[in-house]
């Protein structure tokens, strides 16, 4: 857990970091990280319960340093037949410009996104920046947030599939950046702790 005091230089889960407060959220300036988000896949649907991932059966794991964060017709364990699984991505989002970002998630079925302090702890469906929960066809939900260039914001995304199609796509846009899935150079994770 981060230390919420007056110190500016700390060690955070084995990563050197500098604390900064922005828009009532805690952000971190990381000095040790790897490109991508840390992705884990679990057996079973999360049932709109963010804590599901703490005790669920892990099926695959590893960094996902792709240029975009997508799950479309993904390969899943044969025991799940690709119809009953959940995925979580952990890491940091580092904006390239200081402005208002619109973050989007399209999913089939339920998905959630937290960015800032709630991504680290205390995350619930009620405080999710994006709540696209429930069993449904492909639906897009968005949120806007003011972000500062070069600051590493904790980000957590969760997705679940419970039958039918399986789609998860993360996009972002700003007044100066057209809507895109390309997160090259914007997402990072802690290689020591596999996430934060």
What are these regions (language model features)?
Residues 1-30:
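Intrinsically disordered, compositionally biased repeat/linker segments
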Residues 31-196:
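Acidic/polar, compositionally biased interaction segments
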């Amino acid at each position: 857990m981060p230390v919420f005091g007056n110190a500016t230089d700390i060690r955070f889960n084995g990563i050197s970091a500098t604390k900064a407060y922005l828009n009532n959220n805690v952000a971190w300036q990381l000095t040790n990280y790897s490109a991508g988000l840390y992705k884990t896949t679990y057996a079973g649907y999360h049932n709109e319960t963010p804590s599901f991932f703490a005790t669920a059966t892990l099926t695959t794991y590893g960094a996902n340093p792709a240029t975009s964060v997508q799950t479309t017709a993904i390969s899943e364990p044969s025991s799940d037949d690709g119809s009953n699984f959940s995925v979580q991505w952990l890491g940091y989002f580092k904006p390239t410009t200081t402005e208002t970002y619109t973050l989007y998630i399209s999913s089939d079925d339920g998905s959630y996104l937290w960015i800032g302090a709630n991504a680290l702890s205390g995350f619930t469906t009620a405080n999710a920046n994006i709540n696209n929960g429930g069993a449904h066809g492909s639906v897009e939900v968005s949120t806007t947030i003011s972000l500062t260039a070069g600051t590493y914001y904790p980000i957590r995304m969760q997705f679940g599939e419970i039958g039918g199609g399986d789609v998860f796509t993360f996009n972002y846009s700003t007044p100066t950046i057209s809507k895109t899935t390309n997160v090259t150079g914007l997402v990072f994770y802690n290689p020591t702790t596999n996430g934060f």
